Amino acid sequence: MKVLAIIGSPKKGNSYRITQQVENRLKSYAKHDSIGKVDLEFDYLFLKDANLELCKGCFACIPRGENKCPLKDSRADIEKRILASDGIILVSPVYSMNVSWLMKNFMDRFAYTLHRPIFVNQKLMLIVTAGEVGLKETLKSLSYTMGGSDLVSKLAVKTPPFKYRPKYEESIARDVDKASQKFYKSLKSDKPLPPTFLNVLWFQAFKAISEKTKHHFPADYEFYKDKNYFFYETKVNPLKTFAAKFMIRLFLRGFDKNFYTK
């Protein structure tokens, strides 16, 4: 199994240190797995060193497709690295109650995956560190990326610039263990979780809107036109589909009152 940690810090500080601890835990679990030694490859992508230019906000990737982005850098190569991985760890320190600018730019450059989820085979773990406050807010912000991925584990660690007492070091170790075990367990399962109602609602909403706005958002229309029930082949509870479509019909009534889409 392959794990890619995407580091959004401009330096190798607390966020990197905690990620290294997770790496060590995962490799230990793989080495001593009950089924025998598991081959686990752990790699890093440091956004500070990546050739990922600042998003221009041109909106080209959303309606027309990511291949229409005017920036010629390593975005497509990064996408390939993510798709080739079984697990992704997004890592960011808390800056001004949110993710770092490096991570925010990464999120902006891959915003098209929220319209067209492609990371359906990837398990996702989030790691955030902060001196004291902003952990909850940053985790929430970081969760709105990597469209299609299965968010299975979150780790938030307070890392103030003081020497830690032994008991606090132990509490960090316990949190790292718990989050790492949860992530490792999910990596061993190649079966995606059954779609929740919110997942189905998300799919049906984008499919319905893509059909109504196909001239404005051709990339979305092409992505959804051959998909009937979900982003990938899986069993979907018909009651969830019925309820989602009913809610979307109600939503579209208001949509049509406010916007011209033809």
Predicted regions and their residues:
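N-terminal beta1-alpha1-beta2 submodule of the flavodoxin-like/Rossmannoid cofactor-binding fold
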Residues: 1-91, 97-105, 111-112, 152, ...
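Conserved anion/nucleotide-ligand pocket segment
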Residues: 149, 153-185
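Compact, basic/aliphatic-enriched, mixed alpha/beta core segments that act as assembly/interaction modules
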Residues: 137-140, 144, 148, 182, ...
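Short histidine/acidic/glycine/proline-rich micro-motifs that form metal-
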Residues: 9-13, 96, 129-133, 160-163
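"Short basic amphipathic alpha-helical interaction patches in structured regions
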Residues: 103-107, 140-143
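P-loop/Walker A phosphate-binding loop and immediately adjacent motor/lid segment at beta-alpha junctions
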Residues: 45, 105-123, 129-130
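Short, glycine-/small-residue-rich phosphate/pyrophosphate-handling segment
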Residues: 119-158
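A short secondary-structure junction signal
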Residues: 101, 135-140, 167-168
